[in-house]
C-alpha cells in the first residue's frame, strides 16, 4: 500500500504536467526536425558536388585544359539553374504547396533532377555515337519545340490561375479589413467562399501535390535544347568523345552540370519556403503576403511565358525585325531574367513586410509578432 494517496486535484495537476511535458517534447522534436531537414538536404547536395569534383580530379588531374572544361560545365549548371523558366516554375509550385500545409524545400531539387536527366541521357547518346552532332537536327528541333511549348504553356496557365486567385484574395482581404476579421477560423471561412473560378481551377493545382511531382515537369522542361548552357554542355561532351575519351570521362561533365544546377534550384525553393513561413505566422499577414506574392507571380509568369510563346511563334513562322528582334534577344538572355525574378521576389517579400507593418498592423494597433525558430535561420542557406 502506498504511504500516501493522491487527491483528485493532485491527479489532475499531475496529468496536466505530463501533458505539458509531452507537448514540450513533441515541440522539441519538431524543432529538431525543422533544423535537420535543410541541413540534411544541403549536406547531401554538397556531398554530391564534392563527389562529382573528385571524379573529375581523378580523371583529369594531369590535364589542366580538360579540368578548365569541367569547371565550365559546372558553371553552366549554376547558370542554367537561374533561367527564368526554372525560377518561375519552382516559386509558383512552392507557393501552391505551402498553401496546403507542406514544406516543399526539395521542389527545386526534383525539378533540377528531372531537367538534368534529359541532359544526362542526351550526353550518353552522344558519347555512345548513337546520335552525332551532324545528324541530330531533327531530334534537336523536335526537342526544342516540345520543351519551349511545355515551358510557355505551363507558365501561362500558372499566370491565369494566379490572376484568378489574386482577384479573389483582394476581395477577401478587403472584406477582412472592413469586418475586422483577424482570427484564423474567420479568414479560413472567407477563403472557403472565394467564388466559382477558384473552385474550378483547384484541380489544376492538385496536379502537383508533392515536391517529387516536379521531376516529370522538369524532365519536360529539359526537352528543349535551345539554351546556350545546354548546347554548350553537349558540345563539350561531344568534343571529348570525338577525341577518343571513354564514356566515364565524358559523363563527368553532365554530372558536374547536374550537381551545380541542383544546388542552386534547391536553394531557391528553400529560400522561398522561408519567405512563405514568415507570412504564415499570423492569419492576416498570411493573406496580405499571399496577395503581394501572387501579384508578383502573375507578372512574372505572364512576362516569361509570353516571351517564350512569342519566341516559339516567331521561330515557327520565321518572323524577324522590329519587335521580333527584341523577343529573340529576351529569349537568349533568360538566365539574366531569372536573376531579375529572384530579385523581384526578394523585393516583394521586403515590401510586404514594410507595408504590412506600416499600413496593416500599425493601423490596427497590433504588434507584428515574430516567431524566431532555428529552422528560419537554417533555411536561409
From Swiss-Prot:
One of its GO terms (molecular function) is high-affinity nickel cation transmembrane transporter activity. One of its GO terms (cellular component) is plasma membrane. Residues 61-63, 132-149, 237-243, 314-333 are periplasmic. Residues 1-39, 85-110, 171-215, 265-292, 355-381 are cytoplasmic. One of its GO terms (biological process) is nickel cation import across plasma membrane. It is a multi-pass membrane protein. It is found in: Cell inner membrane. The keyword Transmembrane applies. Pfam families: NicO. Keywords: Cell inner membrane, Cell membrane, Membrane, Nickel, Transmembrane, Transmembrane helix, Transport. Its main location: membrane. The chain crosses the membrane at residues 40-60, 64-84, 111-131, 150-170, 216-236, 244-264, 293-313, 334-354. Belongs to the NiCoT transporter (TC 2.A.52) family. Involved in nickel incorporation/metabolism into the hydrogenase apoprotein. This is Hydrogenase nickel incorporation protein HupN. The gene is hupN.
